Amino acid sequence: MNWVNKSVPQEFILLVFSDQPWLEIPPFVMFLFSYILTIFGNLTIILVSHVDFKLHTPMYFFLSNLSLLDLCYTTSTVPQMLVNICNTRKVISYGGCVAQLFIFLALGSTECLLLAVMCFDRFVAICRPLHYSIIMHQRLCFQLAAASWISGFSNSVLQSTWTLKMPLCGHKEVDHFFCEVPALLKLSCVDTTANEAELFFISVLFLLIPVTLILISYAFIVQAVLRIQSAEGQRKAFGTCGSHLIVVSLFYGTAISMYLQPPSPSSKDRGKMVSLFCGIIAPMLNPLIYTLRNKEVKEAFKRLVAKSLLNQEIRNMQMISFAKDTVLTYLTNFSASCPIFVITIENYCNLPQRKFP
């Protein structure tokens, strides 16, 4: 038991951060800027999808789930990275590392399945348009989203448990930006072949199978779009599917290169850069891709801004009216004792003069 306790460090040292302060400024600014854009973009999509009645459709329900994923995905890593860049000691506690590992795995696995679900939604909308409302009913949408979340978190529980059970024998230097399965397996002092095989199998299950189904679905989608007679209909269909296809390419491309490529001398540094792109850059780009290419989202955002400005103007008018009524009430009550003063105020405000007893 003592050997097991000694094998678990109290904290991990992250080696990828530089000790030179002048080298830390560019990544700090880049990570902070990306994080702010990610927060703003994904919160905007969630808010617009929830508030605007025209966006209460399966497509935007799944899109808001994706935005929530990206929001949490980035929040699980970037704040700790910003803290480490600013501090002299580049460390993360054991509990923080466990939480980061679990959340990163859970949200990444969920996104793998959710992107496939979103592709199924587009397949039904384009290839079965007359049956779309019957097939993609509200209950099925909730079931598909719940299945994605539950499967992702279940996979994270298994992988995190298997990874953290490996004895570290006092090793605590993580050559990565954050806690991730491949980086933690390298700290183990025993053979990790079984864990690497398990990781490869899970990667095939959550990456290759969904992306294969997505490619097959898009083959049918392209055939259906080409059969559309109107150019406007084709352009709208390709625009909607194009945004999703770009997001799919970014996510699955980086994830497959990170988990399924054979090891090579340059694979370690490439894996760190790919993880950085997948965990920070991709969540920032997803809202931009969907909003810039989606006319409905842009119009809904404009309606939301216009509604907010109108509500603010109404509140200002109500405050002015309330202040005016308050002043007039006070003047009315005050008129008996100071009629000359009230007449002067009413003349100044262009109010109708009243007769005093």
Curated annotation (Swiss-Prot):
GO molecular function per UniProt: G protein-coupled receptor activity; olfactory receptor activity
Main location per the UniProt record: membrane
Keyword terms: Cell membrane, Disulfide bond, G-protein coupled receptor, Glycoprotein, Membrane, Olfaction, Receptor, Sensory transduction, Transducer, Transmembrane, Transmembrane helix
Membrane-crossing segments per the record: 26-49, 58-79, 101-120, 140-158, 196-219, 237-259, 273-292
Glycan attachment sites: N5
Cellular component terms (Gene Ontology): plasma membrane
Spans within the Extracellular topological domain: 1-25, 80-100, 159-195, 260-272
Disulphide bonds in the chain: C97-C189
Record-linked PROSITE patterns: G_PROTEIN_RECEP_F1_1, G_PROTEIN_RECEP_F1_2
UniProt superkingdom: Eukaryota
Stretches in topological domain Cytoplasmic: 50-57, 121-139, 220-236, 293-357
UniProt cross-references to InterPro entries, sorted A to Z: GPCR_Rhodpsn (IPR000276), GPCR_Rhodpsn_7TM (IPR017452), Olfact_rcpt (IPR000725)
Any Pfam family matching the protein: 7tm_4
An example Gene Ontology biological process: detection of chemical stimulus involved in sensory perception of smell
Topology class, membrane: Multi-pass membrane protein
PANTHER family: OLFACTORY RECEPTOR (PTHR26453)
Family statement: Belongs to the G-protein coupled receptor 1 family.
Name under which the protein is recorded: Olfactory receptor 2B2
Organism: Homo sapiens (Human)
Protein encoded by which gene: OR2B2
